From Swiss-Prot:
Disulfide bonds: none annotated. It comes from Homo sapiens (Human). One of its GO terms (cellular component) is cytoskeleton. Residues 431-778 form a coiled coil. Expressed specifically in testis. Also expressed in tumors of different origins. It comes from the Eukaryota. Keywords: Coiled coil, Nucleus, Phosphoprotein. This is Coiled-coil domain-containing protein 110. The gene is CCDC110.
């Protein structure tokens, strides 16, 4: 398979896992799930989905099994990778330790692991287990920082002594140290940098305190990376994983603090002047064992160097074999971490860099120093370096201990050779065991890859099922929305029905009042029924005497009962017809009310028109007093006004006739209602008589049939009358509309008369002016200016008063439209003349 197809399949598996985790979280009520990495943004939103429990359980079981297998493989791969890196680093350090110690004049104090107390061995085993879960990110950070710090960056002008003395201390096993807290590098004249340290070795200065190094120190901060630590099985969320990692780190720090405390105690014991001088210090049994162990190590320092060189060559061969295996393991590790999405982009990039560096670095004498930079620096050796600082300060305070330190360093030189050979033998066995375990792990990895392919094939139908379930959930949500809309519509309908029910209650109250009236009538009918029952008893006594005729009468009675049932059905039909008639009656009443309202409105309009006519009459009287000179014109106007009055009187007479007709209609309706009620009462009385009289049932049935026919005919007659009334109402409405049109025409005619009056007034003024002008001319001709002026002034005063009175009244002001009408009328009159 090509790498592109593999990536596609991995992406499909990841998408399926994400969708399945969303489904599980929604079914179990989990609101948020996802990874805490901001680069991947795996923040799952809570989705309320309705899904079957069986499918969810199957998905959950398969996911748990798949993820458990994946986490186991990750653990195994990480353990193998960390252990191989440790073995390589330690083997390289051991190869270079003799030369390194000879060049730097360093002496290492060691102890054999088998002679350690049982308590310390148990602590070491627990620490081994915990450190297997640490990742290789510390390597990358140390590589980057150490590669950047070259020899040239460190000051060369500082005078530092080349001899460093060490003391015998308790050390832990090499496989437990993976993290580095602080790396402190001391420069010197003869060496570039102290690059790598082992858990078995610790450096202590023997130089006098006045010759301490004043150079700057390069401190490398601890770089942390966390790998999922499985305490109680598979963690469902990354928050739980982070919490477990924090707990693991706290435990590691506690163990580290305990080890630092032990080393401090050993240093205090070894550097205490009372112990060295007087020997009065009471040591604990643990400390006595430690001191005895140091003495035994000093005795075993005279082994052959040829055996040591052979073992070192064997170690180099093993290292060459392990390097390609380390590359394959790192590839598997990266492959599984991609599937889990628990490696960040920076970690992936650094992992690739680490693989390239491992490929490029051969194990030769030239590159041994470069490999030292890439090796893992153990934590406890670094803590010992920190302790060297404190011991340097203590020795500044206690300068008299320098001689004793030099004596101890000479004793430690003898124990170095024995310790290295035994360490090489133990590490060769350790490497062989790890090779076997790595082969088994490769087989397991291949099996797990085949299982992963099977799981991918099984996950495809699960993808389709999840998609179908999601579609079903969407359809259910749409149905819910539709139901909510239907609910809102039903609520609106309910509000309308409540209003309708209130109206029905009002009508029901009216029906109850009618029902009370009918109950009174029923009481009277019951009294009649009692009387008829007495008569019935008498008839039964007579019937007892006529038992011979009973058989014949029973057959007749059956026929009569059938006819009675028919009659009762017809009576019910009559009742329904009566109700329909009542409804029609109510409609007629409503129409009559409307007609009355229209009548009242017309009466008001007539009153207004009459008031306007009265005002016109008053204006005409004023015009008569003022227009004595124009009597002929005014007489014509009066004649026209008389005609108008006659038309108005005719309209009022027509309205009075309409009112009388409406009153007749109302009286007719009232009489019709009374007749209907009387007929209903008669029908009820007749029905009770028909039911209770058994002797004259046959005759009464015939009479009832005749009455039914008569009522049907009466109903038809009433319907026809109702139709006639409706037609008459339509005619009345038409007549009312005609009257309104006539009224509008009359109003227009009155307005035209007013316009003509205004034109006549205007003509009168014009004639007065012409008369005054003519009189002035005549006066001038007779040469009588005094009279003319007197007359002209008098007439002018009269004319001014007249015009002032005319202009003061707003009705006498002619409009432009009236003037135009006046000139048109004048032109027409001139043409007629």
């Amino acid at each position: 398979m090509s790498p592109e197809k593999q990536h596609r399949e991995e992406d499909e598996v990841d998408s399926v896992l994400l969708s399945a985790s969303k489904i599980l979280n929604s079914s179990e009520g989990v609101k948020e799930s996802g990874c805490s990495d901001t680069e991947y943004g795996c923040i799952a939103e809570s989705e309320n989905q309705i899904q079957p429990q069986s499918a969810l359980k199957v998905l959950q079981q398969q996911l748990e099994s798949f993820q458990a297998l994946r986490m186991q493989t990750l653990q195994n791969v990480s353990m193998v990778q960390s252990e191989i890196s440790e073995i390589l680093n330690k083997s390289i350090i051991e190869v270079e330790n003799p030369q390194f110690s000879s060049e730097k004049n360093l002496v290492f104090g060691t102890r054999i692991e088998k002679d350690l107390p049982t308590e310390n061995q148990e602590e070491n085993l627990s620490m081994e287990k915990s450190h297997h879960f640490e990742d290789s990110k510390t390597l990358h950070s140390v590589e980057e920082k150490l590669s950047g710090d070259s020899v040239n960056s460190l000051p060369q002008s500082v005078n530092v002594p080349s001899q460093i003395h060490s003391e015998d201390t308790l050390t832990l096993r090499t496989s437990t140290d993976n993290l580095s807290s602080n790396i402190i590098i001391h420069p010197s004249e003869n060496s570039d940098i102290l690059k790598n340290y082992n858990n078995f070795y610790r450096f202590l200065p023997t130089a006098p305190p006045n010759v301490m190094s004043q150079a700057d120190t390069v401190i490398l901060d601890k770089s942390k990376i966390t790998v999922p630590f499985l305490k109680h099985g598979f963690c469902e969320n990354l928050d739980d994983i982070c919490h477990s990692i924090k707990q693991m780190k706290e435990e590691l720090q506690k163990s580290h603090d305990g080890e630092v405390a032990l080393t401090n105690e050993l240093q205090t014991l070894q550097t205490d002047p009372d112990v060295h001088r007087n020997g009065k210090y009471d040591m604990s049994p643990i400390h006595q064992d430690k001191m005895n162990f140091i003495k035994e190590e000093n005795l075993d320092g005279n082994l052959n160097e040829d055996i040591k060189s052979k073992r070192i060559s064997e170690l180099e061969a093993l290292v060459k074999k392990l390097l390609p295996f380390r590359e394959t393991v790192s590839k598997f590790h990266v492959h599984f971490c991609r599937k889990c999405k628990k490696l960040s982009k920076s970690e992936m990039h650094r992992g690739k860099k680490n693989e390239k560096n491992n490929k490029e670095i051969p194990i030769t004498g030239k590159n041994i120093t470069d490999l030292k930079f890439h090796s893992r620096v153990p934590r406890y050796t670094l803590s010992f370096l920190d302790q060297t600082k404190h011991e340097m300060k203590d020795k500044e305070r206690q300068p008299f201990l320098v001689k004793q330190g030099s004596i101890i360093s000479e004793n430690e030189k003898t124990s170095k050779v024995n310790s290295v050979t035994e360490q090489c033998v133990a590490k060769i066995q350790y490497l062989q065991n790890y090779l076997k375990e790595s082969v088994q792990i490769q087989k397991k990895v291949m099996e797990l890859e085949s299982e992963n392919l099977n799981l991918k094939s099984k996950m495809k139908p699960l993808i389709f099922t999840t998609q179908s379930l999601i579609q079903k959930v969407e359809t259910y949500e749409k149905q819910l929305k539709n139901l909510v809309e239907e609910k809102s519509t039903i609520q609106s309908k309910l509000s309308k029905t409540e209003e309708y029910s209130k109206e029905c209650l009002k009508e029901f109250k009216k029906i109850i009042s009618k029902y009370n009236v009918l109950q009174g009538q029923n009481k009277t009918l019951e009294e009649k029924n009692i009387q008829l029952s007495l008569e019935k008893q008498q008839m039964m006594e007579a019937l007892d005497q006529l038992k011979s005729k009973e058989h014949k009468t029973q057959s007749d009675m059956a026929i009569v009962n059938n006819e009675n049932n028919r009659m009762s059905i017809e009576m019910e039909a009559m009742k329904t017809n009566i109700l329909l008639i009542q409804d029609e009656k109510e409609m007629l009443e409503k129409k009559t009310h409307q007609l009355l309202k229209e009548k009242s409105s017309l009466g008001n309009e007539l009153k207004e028109s009459q008031l306007e006519i009265i005002q016109l009459k008053e204006k005409e009287r004023l015009a008569k007093t003022e227009q004595e000179t124009l009597l002929q014109i005014i007489e014509t106007v009066k004649d026209e006004k008389l005609n108008l009055e006659t038309t108005l009187q005719e309209s009022t007479a027509a309205r009075q006739i309409m009112e009388r007709e409406i009153e007749n209609i109302q009286t007719y309706q009232s009489t019709a209602e009374e007749n209907f009620l009387q007929e209903i009462k008669n029908a009820k009385s007749e029905a009770s008589i028909y039911k209770n009289s058994l002797s004259e049932i046959g005759k009464e049935c015939e009479m009832l049939s005749k009455m039914v026919m008569e009522t049907k005919t009466d109903n038809q007659i009433l319907k026809e009358e109702l139709k006639k009334h409706s037609q008459e109402n339509i005619k009345f409405e038409n007549s009312i509309s005609r009257l309104t049109e006539d009224k509008i025409l009359l109003e227009n005619y009155v307005r035209s008369i007013e316009n003509e009056r205004d034109t006549l007034e205007f003509e009168m003024r014009h004639l007065q002016r012409e008369y005054l002008s003519l009189s002035d001319k005549i006066c001038n001709q007779h040469n009588d200016p005094s009279k003319t002026t007197y007359i002209s002034r008098r007439e002018k005063f009269h004319f001014d008063n007249y015009t002032h009175e005319d202009t003061s009244s707003p009705q006498s002001r002619p409009l432009a439209s009236d003037l135009k009408g006046y000139f048109k009328v004048k032109d027409r009159t001139l043409k007629h003349h």
